Curated annotation (Swiss-Prot):
Species of origin: Homo sapiens (Human)
Effect of residue 330 to N: In GT2; not expressed on the surface and absent inside the transfected cells
Residues binding Ca(2+) 2, per UniProt: 184, 241, 243, 245-246, 277
Cytoplasmic side: 742-788
Domain named I-EGF: residues: 463-498, 499-548, 549-585, 586-625
Residues annotated to bind Ca(2+) 1: 149, 152-153, 277, 361
Record remark on domains: The VWFA domain (or beta I domain) contains three cation-binding sites: the ligand-associated metal ion-binding site (LIMBS or SyMBS), the metal ion-dependent adhesion site (MIDAS), and the adjacent MIDAS site (ADMIDAS). This domain is also part of the ligand-binding site.
Protein name (Swiss-Prot/TrEMBL): Integrin beta-3
Amino acid sequence: MRARPRPRPLWATVLALGALAGVGVGGPNICTTRGVSSCQQCLAVSPMCAWCSDEALPLGSPRCDLKENLLKDNCAPESIEFPVSEARVLEDRPLSDKGSGDSSQVTQVSPQRIALRLRPDDSKNFSIQVRQVEDYPVDIYYLMDLSYSMKDDLWSIQNLGTKLATQMRKLTSNLRIGFGAFVDKPVSPYMYISPPEALENPCYDMKTTCLPMFGYKHVLTLTDQVTRFNEEVKKQSVSRNRDAPEGGFDAIMQATVCDEKIGWRNDASHLLVFTTDAKTHIALDGRLAGIVQPNDGQCHVGSDNHYSASTTMDYPSLGLMTEKLSQKNINLIFAVTENVVNLYQNYSELIPGTTVGVLSMDSSNVLQLIVDAYGKIRSKVELEVRDLPEELSLSFNATCLNNEVIPGLKSCMGLKIGDTVSFSIEAKVRGCPQEKEKSFTIKPVGFKDSLIVQVTFDCDCACQAQAEPNSHRCNNGNGTFECGVCRCGPGWLGSQCECSEEDYRPSQQDECSPREGQPVCSQRGECLCGQCVCHSSDFGKITGKYCECDDFSCVRYKGEMCSGHGQCSCGDCLCDSDWTGYYCNCTTRTDTCMSSNGLLCSGRGKCECGSCVCIQPGSYGDTCEKCPTCPDACTFKKECVECKKFDRGALHDENTCNRYCRDEIESVKELKDTGKDAVNCTYKNEDDCVVRFQYYEDSSGKSILYVVEEPECPKGPDILVVLLSVMGAILLIGLAALLIWKLLITIHDRKEFAKFEEERARAKWDTANNPLYKEATSTFTNITYRGT
């Protein structure tokens, strides 16, 4: 049967519908077409196949068939082998509310033990709940770079213990802190070896004294006496190394694995604070000093509290560090200066449970950095799986806040202390391992609590226990009677082992060919007693009445038969559930195409074979989530900022924030240039304030929203300024009016005066006596006077 597309079932009914798709719905019955000859082979065909061991089964009826078909053929119900997969809870202590009191009795994961019984190609669902309990004990180990460049930082943290205890005791009543220091391997070329005095005082040429160089030293075991932290820090002095990178990874490894020296408690959150202003050496760098022995991940801190293997063992690799940090349930905090923050950000993407903070040049902000990092760690729950058998595959669905089910996710963010989240897990088995019982562990990163899953691979039939060797039912002892059929011994054939290979007759050849003229046993077997005995092959199994089928002639895709997602039957691929295509290379699942905003391919493409094909111009990324030129690039992220940062907006009102917004929110004072893939966005909120943020996705695929802490809001009016302004305006207006009035009067007077002057200039008066004027004297002439 050629592989063909099958409709994708709902995740809750994958088992039933997926099985039916291969056993008779719209196609041949796979149980009867695989040519199986034993109960064990029948169970491996499909989860829907059953085997009948009833001796009274009518002749010609298949023993491997659907259960309902076997019952129709009058197979006794007690003779039907049909194991059913199941999940049983073995241990289920209730989740705790608080971590105070006896911390060994605190439970943050439920259930604690589960037993799975799975038959081949079957799956089973189970769930796990996780709660971040309140007032949980905390261990903080402060690991400091004591190279010369950190001299001012050492002075800044002399009172850190008291301040840290004051802040952290707002979150937990059970705090312990410790201290350790590192520089680098005390061997050339990492240290100064000449002149001789440089060995005792590496700062000889700087007119000062510092400690001889050391790799790592443990200073203070975890203690609740915070004043001792201050005292021990004040006793420390810096040293000096020759090259720029430090030996911090050596220190991290020893602080992680030396449980007894450090004092890590089993029932506490473990924080390892790593502070430096420089790069760090990694695995294989030790070869510069001729150190070729790989790091063994063991504790080598001696009675003097110094790392004794510093000069004989290479630096640890990131993989080894990740393994040990996970085993010890330690959350690593990189507190590094801005010049190296990008490097340690890349490291954190490879180490689960790690956070990065920017350390000021004098470490003055380390207190707030630790508190913020602890809050970030406690706001996230992420599951990790250990020792998963290769025959098993797991798929996750997360139920975070507000009972929102998010398919394909095994982490929840934005949590508060006391919140409870759950995860639905589907375990599916392929094949039958030699070891029938195995176990694996599921645990939240950084938690001591875990879920242990015990798996039993149900590949055998119960009737095999009643097998009769050399049974009289098999032609007087020529075979073993097992599960209703004879398993013939060497040299015997037939349904009852009645035919010997030595009894050869030429007429039997015709019974070994499907049609006249066709090759006997398809040229891949011998005809004995009228039955084909198929040849063995190094490539796989040859089966069928005429040896016409095999399980190795199917097409290969990327070097794997049927892409590793199906079984080869008679040259055709029979695809597993959730897979289709001629090569079984196309998944029908769409959760891999689900973007962080809850839309298929971010609404910019279509999902084909489990991958997004971006349609909208300018969009790219695994889920078409990146599209700087798209008009909605900032629009949707704006809603996430409003919801997750400011607890408002449409998504907040609809309680769908965690479903659609899986971004990590980080508050910053100002936006920085994080590369060409970063998208800067700006919008006005309901208060008419301008909010600026940056959308960035790092190399691991984690989406981060950097939001400026304080929105730029228009300032309200200053009453005093307004009052003075009004009064000033009134005075100015009055003064201006007076000035204008005075100006107008002056202009008018000048005009009148000019007119007067003009008229006076035009006036021309004749000389004459005033007719009204009378002189003071009057002269009269006496006409009678004649004079003498």
